[in-house]
């Protein structure tokens, strides 16, 4: 499937400001800076398992089906309900305060998140 694979962070834009906006502590932000987040995605049709592995052994795994409401968790351990959509080949998570898009561009996973007016971008290369 289009998204299935294991990806490692290659570049980030606006990391510190975005993580502060999410409410992460300075210590946690420091630990995560320049860390190569590993994203593992399994896609089976409209069903996804999306796991991200962070510094210190912290991992988040979200399961969702395109078009169905689900509860998701953020890196800041905040949970929210959302209906994940697929728009023009992009996975889109859109709630009152958070907007996130993910797409494959030239074989790379490109994620753009907006929270509280702050935009963060992470580009990851496929490693498996």
Swiss-Prot record:
Subcellular location: Cytoplasm; Membrane
InterPro entries: Calycin, Fatty_acid-bd, ILBP
Any one Gene Ontology BP term: fatty acid transport
Disulfide pairings: none
Alphabetized GO MF terms: fatty acid binding
Modified residues (N-acetylalanine): 2
Membrane topology: Peripheral membrane protein
Recorded GO CC terms: cytosol; membrane; nucleus
Broad class of the protein's primary localization: cytoplasm
Keywords noted in UniProt: Acetylation, Cytoplasm, Lipid-binding, Membrane, Transport
Keyword Transit peptide appears in the UniProt entry: no
One Pfam family this sequence matches: Lipocalin_7
Domain remark from Swiss-Prot or TrEMBL: Forms a beta-barrel structure that accommodates hydrophobic ligands in its interior. Can bind at least two ligands per molecule, however, the stoichiometry is debated.
Function: Binds to bile acids and is involved in enterohepatic bile acid metabolism. Required for efficient apical to basolateral transport of conjugated bile acids in ileal enterocytes. Stimulates gastric acid and pepsinogen secretion.
Family listed: Belongs to the calycin superfamily. Fatty-acid binding protein (FABP) family.
Listed name of the protein: Gastrotropin
Biological source species: Bos taurus
Lineage of the organism: Eukaryota, Metazoa, Chordata, Craniata, Vertebrata
